[in-house]
Regions:
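Catalytic or ion-coupling anion/metal-binding cores of large enzyme and transporter domains
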Residues: 1-234, 238-258, 263-366
Length: 366
């Protein structure tokens, strides 16, 4: 039938995928995969062509609920979800509520709506898979953050997994600095008692360039979650690295620009006041609001880099050809963290993300 990948991977199908991810409390990694898939499909600017940070947050906060009681934030596993009908139940309920575009083409040559009609999935069972009308959580599972620590609006929080610390949707904490994940793991092993209530752990130099390769940090987040539960404290974590879908807690990833290229996260110092404000969808370092302090710290960082052959000494070791290629060519997480020579993002046969008449709306909300 001469169906090509670009017939299937379109602006509308990518938007559908993001909405499904929100509705199941999915991994923060969706905001790495989606921009890179969009680029491979010909869209050069994810924010302009597919979905802006502002629209993403509006949908997550006001339109799309979480409709599964699933680990790591809930009770049930993917096996349980599959036993209740799986993803087709979720997609049908989202589509019936007005949240998904059913006109997108699928690999069966049917539209999404035609495919769901043929499969005729059951209604949500109400225990494992909830409905949009009576959701598990009222708001979507993900939130993108801006602010002076994330001017690219790349930072992402898995809101569905937050267990505490957001009184009135605001976290106010003290920065605890760790240059590299191993430094944090060593501290958690040897002296975990140093962490106090409302600490904000900063793990940096783990981004696409700094890692290099943006390594996953499930080990760190799992240990911090255990620490918090055992000591009845709130400890948050922020990093220019990334997390597994299994992470829970107040953890913020993909902060960019990353530390290895001199992003604001590199300029945070021990004890700085860090505010996460979900009313504004921002993460800010209060001392860096002072332009003189920002300039002084940036000059100090640059001096360190200049005295180390152009690379900060805290970056990870690029000891293979692939890792060295990543160090020299990786772009920011907000663009998918892929490798592009000269960090000039390559898009083959670019196309425009023309808007359709479909607008996601929840018929159960006014």
């Amino acid at each position: 039938k001469n169906i090509t990948p670009r017939d299937i991977v379109t602006r509308e199908s990518i938007r559908n995928a993001i909405i499904v991810a929100m509705s199941v409390g999915g991994s923060t990694n969706v905001m790495l995969h989606a921009p890179e898939i969009a680029r491979a499909a010909g869209y050069s600017n994810f924010s302009e062509d597919i979905m802006s940070a502002a629209e993403f947050n509006h949908l997550s906060k006001n339109v799309i609920p979480v409709i599964v009681d699933a680990r790591p934030f809930g009770k049930y596993s993917m096996v349980d979800i599959d036993s209740k009908g799986g993803i087709q139940v979720i997609v049908k309920d989202l589509m019936d509520a007005g949240l998904l575009n059913g006109n997108t083409l699928t690999c069966t040559s049917e539209t999404l709506a035609e495919q769901i009609s043929r499969l005729s999935p059951p209604d949500p069972d109400g225990e494992v898979i909830y409905s949009v009308k009576k959701p598990y959580k009222e708001t979507g599972g993900l939130r993108v953050l801006g602010g002076n620590l994330s001017p690219e609006h790349s930072a992402i929080l898995k809101l569905a997994g937050v267990e505490g610390g957001l009184e009135n949707n605001v976290f106010n904490g003290r920065a605890r600095i760790f240059d590299g994940e191993q430094s944090l793991l060593d501290t958690l092993d040897k002296t975990p008692e140093v962490f106090k209530n409302f600490d904000m752990i900063i793990v940096r130099y783990e981004g696409p360039v700094g890692g290099p390769g943006m390594p996953e940090m499930l080990d760190s987040t799992s240990r911090i979650t255990t620490l918090c539960r055992e000591n009845n404290i709130i400890v948050a974590l922020m990093t220019d690295g990334r997390f597994s879908g299994g992470s829970v807690g107040l953890v913020i990833g993909h902060v960019g620009p990353e530390a290895a290229i001199g992003g604001p996260i590199a300029l945070i110092e021990e004890g700085d006041e860090i505010i996460v404000d979900l009313n504004k969808n921002e993460i800010n370092c209060i001392p860096l609001e002072d332009k003189n302090i920002y300039k002084q710290r940036k000059n100090s960082w640059q001096h360190t880099v200049d005295n180390n052959n152009g690379t900060h000494p805290s970056v990870g070791e690029a000891n293979t050809r692939l890792l060295n290629k990543m160090r020299c060519s990786a772009v920011s997480a907000v663009y998918g963290a892929g490798m592009h020579p000269g960090r000039e993002i390559f898009v083959n046969e670019p196309r425009q993300g023309s808007e359709s008449d479909f607008k996601p709306s929840n018929k159960f909300r006014s």
